[in-house]
Every structure is written in C-alpha cells, then in structure tokens.
C-alpha cells in the first residue's frame, strides 16, 4: 500500500519520454527500475538534430500506456527546440499523469521576454533547472522546482536517498547570489543575451557556408517554439563536422564553445559575454571557412536511430555481461551507455539492441573526435553486452 502513494510509485512502472534525453534521466531509470516508453522525435534530416515531441505522439503514447506515471519533456533541448509544453501538460493532467520538465538549459525562460514558456508557467509538476548553465551560479549547482500537486517534503525525502550529507555552502551561496541577481536584473540580462545571439546569427549567416538557425525552424508541431538565446550553427556545408570546427576554435583561436557534434556547433552565450566575444567568434568562423573548408564528400549527417528496447535499463545494467568489439556486438543487447559528451544524450542505452546502424554511428563519432563516455572500456573499442 505504501508503494502506491505519490511519486514513489515508479518501480516497474512506465515513464513517457523522448529518446533524446540527457543520460541523467536514463540513469534514474537504472536506479528506480522504471520502464521507458519512448516518444521517438522527428529528425531534421539536414541539421541532424532531434526535434520536440508532437502532441499527437504524446497522446498515442498515453493511449497505449494508460498506467504511465509521468511524462518527461525537454524544455528546451540542447539545440533550443521546444515542444508545445502547455498542451502536453493539459493532456497528461487530464489522464492523471504527472509532467516533469528537464530545464537544464532553461533557467533564462523564467526571466526572459519573448522566450518559450517555462515549466512552472505551463503547469508542470516538477522542473529541474541547472542554474550553473545560463543562470551564473557555480558548476554543479541546480534547483528543483515543484508544483502544487507535488508534496515538497516527500520530494525532499527522495532526494536525501542519493544527495550528499555534506552540502557545499560555496555552491549554495552561489545559487542564492545568482537567484538574487536574476530576480533584480534577469530580464534585462537575458534580453541582452538574446540580442547578441540574434546579431551572431545574422553575422554568421552572412559569411556563407554556415547556417545559424533560429525561429525560422518553428513549424508549430515538432518545433513548437525556439529558444533564441541558443547559438547553434550547422557546419557540414564547409566540409567540416561540427566537432572539427569545435576543435579548431579551441586549438587555433583560443575560443572554447559549448560543444560540437557530427553536424553542428553550439556556442553558449551567457550573461557574462560581451559583443566583443561575439565578434571574435564570428571572425574565427570566417577564418576557418577560408583556411580549412573542403569538399563535404564522405561526411555523414547526424541521424536518429529508433531504439529497440529489449529489456529495462535496470535489468540490463545489472545483468551478467560479456565484452565484445563494437562490430561483433551487432545484434546483442547493450549492458551500458555509449554517448558523445557533451551533449550527453546516449547513442545507446542499457537494454537496447545494438544494430549495424548504431555500431557504424559510434565508430564514425569516434573517428571524428567526439568525446565518448559511458562504457567500461575507456577507449570505447569494446562494449559490454548481455551474456
């Protein structure tokens, strides 16, 4: 009886979520035993990025899994894509299902004007906010917001199961200082960030060969809205993968951006950046095109590969395993994560069947220099699969 109360009722229960979630969400499934019901997002074939969850997709997932306990929504995704959060909340609540929002990259949504709706304003039940990303606090400091339908004291009990008993007052102080700063100057700060991002998009697009995308992607469904503070740039048309441009910016121009993937780079513009920093980035990208551009033959686009979930993440993670080379693992069930970090979205998760396409994608990402994580083998030459 006790197990069936509140948010604790997750063991062997289902949670509806997009596959392009951060590894921390899937780590939670390993710990609690919940079973994922993936809403496989659309893919922008050119940009190689996963889009948002369409309301019809969520409705079908709820219809097929009426006992699901929660829906998890990225708001926004790493690339700035937003789903129709208000509609998802309304639909889920009508079926007695909680809505959780991953707002790791959405602190500013609570303070900006003309930005996508934030989780709490949309009626979400809980929202995880990484203040250290766009809010200005120290790395590792975050905030968990709860709605009226969630008992904060119960949430505190759950958090205490895994949280350190030796809290860092340095981190707590930085959270409070950042909270105060945003309460007093958040709107003007993020208005300036959005203005710099728009300026950067226009300047980068004028170079040619790059595509810095923004609200022009919005289609009202899989891209319901776009976070204009994000500066995501498609690079394949100059013949370089995003990770290659990322490396050049760091090694040749002393510019450290957020990350590069197979097709794109992401520059995270913060409240501490200045227009001079934007000018340096634009100038470096112009230089890279002039000095390093080449024919794009042989470059792969990023792609979304629908996962086949064979067993639950928890069962796979704790199962007996054996080690196989990536090529020899095709057809087996993965017992571990494989991901490029950042962004930390698993290419492969425990319990998913390894296909030829997944194996080839892992090998290509390694070849291009992506930082690979999640595997027991630090060189990512072998994968742990179910024995």
Region roles according to the model:
Residues 1-11:
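Single conserved hydrophobic/aromatic residue that forms the stacking wall/gate
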Residues 1, 23, 79-82, 136, ...:
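Loop/helix-junction capping segments adjacent to catalytic residues or to phosphate/diphosphate-binding pockets
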Residues 73, 144-146, 233-235, 269, ...:
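Hydrophobic side chains in beta-strands
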Residues 3, 103, 258:
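Acidic-residue sensor for enzyme active/binding pockets
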Residues 15, 285, 369-387:
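Surface-exposed interaction regions enriched in Ser/Thr/Asp/Glu
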Residues 9-217:
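Conserved PLP-enzyme active-site core in the AAT-like
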Residues 205-374:
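Conserved C-terminal alpha-helix-loop-beta "cap" of PLP-dependent enzymes
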């Amino acid at each position: 009886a006790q197990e069936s109360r509140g948010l604790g009722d997750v063991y062997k229960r289902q949670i509806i979520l997009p596959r392009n979630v951060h590894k921390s969400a899937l780590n939670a499934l390993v710990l609690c035993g919940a079973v994922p019901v993936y809403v496989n997002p659309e893919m922008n074939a050119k940009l190689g990025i996963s889009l948002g969850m369409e309301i019809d997709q969520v409705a079908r997932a709820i219809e097929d899994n009426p006992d699901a306990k929660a829906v998890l929504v990225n708001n926004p995704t790493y690339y700035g894509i937003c789903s129709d959060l208000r509609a998802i909340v309304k639909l889920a609540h009508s079926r007695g299902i909680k809505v959780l929002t991953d707002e790791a990259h959405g602190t500013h949504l609570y303070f900006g004007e003309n930005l996508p709706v934030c989780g709490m304003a949309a009626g979400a039940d809980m929202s995880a906010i990484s203040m250290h990303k766009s809010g200005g606090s120290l790395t590792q400091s975050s905030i968990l917001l709860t709605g009226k339908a969630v008992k904060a004291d119960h949430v505190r009990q759950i958090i205490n199961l895994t949280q350190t008993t030796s809290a860092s007052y340095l981190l707590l102080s930085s959270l409070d200082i950042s909270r105060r700063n945003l309460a007093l100057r958040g709107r003007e700060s993020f208005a300036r960030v959005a203005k710099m991002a728009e300026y950067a998009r226009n300047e980068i697009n004028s170079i040619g060969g790059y595509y810095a995308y923004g609200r022009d992607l919005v289609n009202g469904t899989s891209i319901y809205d776009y976070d204009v503070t994000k500066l995501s740039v498609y690079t394949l048309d100059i013949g370089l993968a995003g990770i290659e441009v990322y490396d050049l910016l760091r090694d040749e121009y002393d510019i450290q951006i957020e990350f590069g993937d197979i097709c794109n780079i992401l520059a995270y513009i913060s409240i501490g950046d200045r227009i001079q920093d934007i000018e340096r980035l634009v100038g470096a990208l112009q230089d890279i095109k002039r000095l390093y551009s080449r024919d794009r033959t042989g470059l792969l686009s990023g792609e979304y590969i629908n996962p086949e979930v064979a067993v639950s993440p928890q069962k796979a993670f704790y199962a007996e395993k054996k080690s196989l080379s990536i090529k020899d693992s095709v057809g087996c069930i993965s017992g571990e994560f494989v991901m490029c970090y950042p962004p930390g979205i698993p290419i492969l998760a425990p319990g998913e069947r390894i296909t030829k396409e997944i194996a080839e994608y892992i090998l290509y990402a390694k070849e291009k220099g992506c930082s690979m994580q999640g595997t027991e083998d630090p060189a990512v030459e072998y994968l742990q699969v179910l024995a």
